[in-house]
């Protein structure tokens, strides 16, 4: 259910874009992201910080897109979100509180050097996605950008997550590997 809620705004954005335009899709994205927050709180009695930050960015950049009737704002939002993810990972690493380890460390007890490698891997991934988004958003058609945002970035993130799990599994202690099989 949680994963469905996470994809709800993206699916709504895509569907509304296909039937209307980028401005209707942006308005729908703002509403869907707000509904996501409310539903998440209703179901789980808490809202993750990242969801609040994402909503703030969607609401502000989406509103700017609608007020100025300029899709550049919503296109930049994607790159800014990826930049914030990368900055958060770097900050956590330098402050001695690796974010990936805090999220997955109990289930995947691997050495700190593995967590550090994964952190930098994800930082590079987020930076690459942000830069590629800029290229696609401002060099190719709007429709190409929407498809890239919805399918390309989602697929890249899923593949990256799978590669991360495989890498972590490879470095797990043998007893933990048996437990997970």
From Swiss-Prot:
The membrane spanning regions, by residue number, are: 19-39, 50-70, 80-100, 118-138, 148-168
Q: Which InterPro entries match?
A: YciB
Protein's UniProt keywords contain rRNA-binding: no
Membrane topology designation: Multi-pass membrane protein
The record's subcellular location field reads: Cell inner membrane
Q: Does the keyword Transmembrane helix apply?
A: yes
Q: Which of UniProt's keywords are assigned here?
A: Cell inner membrane, Cell membrane, Membrane, Transmembrane, Transmembrane helix
- GO cellular component terms? plasma membrane
Which family would the database say this protein is a member of?
A: Belongs to the YciB family.
The job of this chain, per UniProt, is described as: Plays a role in cell envelope biogenesis, maintenance of cell envelope integrity and membrane homeostasis.
Q: What is this protein called?
A: Inner membrane-spanning protein YciB
